[in-house]
């Protein structure tokens, strides 16, 4: 686990974005942890969040031309990632996001920001069922662009309806790389390093044993 990944987990815990306990997911599964990126909700939080996304992007080595943030949660993520890339990595990338409903006045259309062309890096908070990615792919393909990769905050590394995770299904269906700032494996490593809550650690490990990929 790299330093920025450890710092990200600490940041998420500090802001109560990452919580341990017992949570019922949309899938009906009982999870020992929950991640709610919507709680990164101040200017300072957003600035820090962008730096972690930018660090993961720089670390990945994936070539891309435009950052795309799907509405709604992806919009501030794309914006803050673009700012962090410019400020901390000397990388000035255009960014774009979509409207849920197309405008019929002014500039019109359903895209805001840069043109959606070339190789697209999609940024979002998490991938659960992959539905948002599939909707975004329709927009990307309609503009004649290609999906270079997807960057999310956390990869839960758990099975979907079949044996693959939602992330693995998206990788298979769209032939792209999906990267995350941290994964369930990193989370377990972090808990092992801390060593101050054996109960949390065992609950997360048991969850991985049952639902992990």
From Swiss-Prot:
- Pathway in which the depicted protein is active: Pyrimidine metabolism; UMP biosynthesis via de novo pathway; UMP from orotate: step 1/2
Necessary cofactors = Mg(2+)
Which Pfam family is one of those matched by this entry? Pribosyltran
- The UniProt annotation places 5-phospho-alpha-D-ribose 1-diphosphate binding at 26, 72-73, 99-100, 103, 105, 124-132
Top EC class, one word: transferase
Record's catalysed reaction(s): orotidine 5'-phosphate + diphosphate = orotate + 5-phospho-alpha-D-ribose 1-diphosphate
**Keywords for this entry?**
Glycosyltransferase, Magnesium, Pyrimidine biosynthesis, Transferase
GO CC annotations, alphabetized: cytoplasm
Residues where orotate binds? 34-35, 128, 156
Q: Which GO terms describe its molecular function?
A: magnesium ion binding; orotate phosphoribosyltransferase activity
The biological process GO terms on file are: 'de novo' pyrimidine nucleobase biosynthetic process; 'de novo' UMP biosynthetic process; pyrimidine ribonucleoside biosynthetic process
InterPro entries, A to Z: OPRT, Or_phspho_trans_dom, PRibTrfase_dom, PRTase-like
What EC number(s) would the UniProt record show? Answer: 2.4.2.10
The UniProt entry, under Gene3D superfamilies, shows: 3.40.50.2020
What the entry lists under NCBIfam families is as follows:
pyrE
- Which family is this sequence assigned to? Belongs to the purine/pyrimidine phosphoribosyltransferase family. PyrE subfamily.
- Role of this protein: Catalyzes the transfer of a ribosyl phosphate group from 5-phosphoribose 1-diphosphate to orotate, leading to the formation of orotidine monophosphate (OMP).
Q: Subunit structure, briefly?
A: Homodimer.
What is the protein's name according to its record? Orotate phosphoribosyltransferase
Please report the organism this UniProt entry assigns to the protein. Answer: Aliivibrio fischeri (strain MJ11)
Gene that this sequence comes from: pyrE
């Amino acid at each position: 686990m790299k330093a920025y990944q450890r710092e990200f987990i600490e940041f998420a815990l500090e802001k109560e974005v990452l919580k341990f306990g017992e949570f019922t997911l949309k899938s009906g599964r009982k999870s020992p942890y929950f991640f709610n990126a919507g709680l990164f909700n101040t200017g300072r939080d957003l600035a820090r969040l962008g730096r972690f996304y930018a660090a993961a992007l720089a670390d990945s080595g994936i070539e891309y031309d435009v950052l795309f943030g799907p509405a709604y949660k992806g919009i501030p993520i794309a914006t803050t990632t673009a700012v962090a890339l410019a400020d901390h990595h000397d990388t000035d990338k255009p960014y774009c996001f979509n409207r849920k409903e197309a405008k019929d006045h002014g500039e019109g259309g359903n895209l805001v920001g840069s043109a959606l062309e070339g190789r697209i890096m999609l940024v979002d908070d998490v991938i659960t069922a992959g539905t948002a990615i599939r909707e975004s792919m329709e927009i990307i393909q309609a503009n004649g662009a290609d999906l270079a990769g997807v960057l999310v905050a956390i990869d839960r590394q758990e099975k979907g309806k079949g044996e693959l995770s939602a992330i693995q299904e998206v990788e298979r269906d769209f032939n792209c790389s999906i990267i995350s700032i941290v994964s369930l494996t990193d989370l377990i490593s972090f808990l092992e390093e801390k060593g101050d809550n054996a109960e949390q650690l065992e609950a997360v490990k048991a969850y991985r044993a049952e639902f992990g990929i």
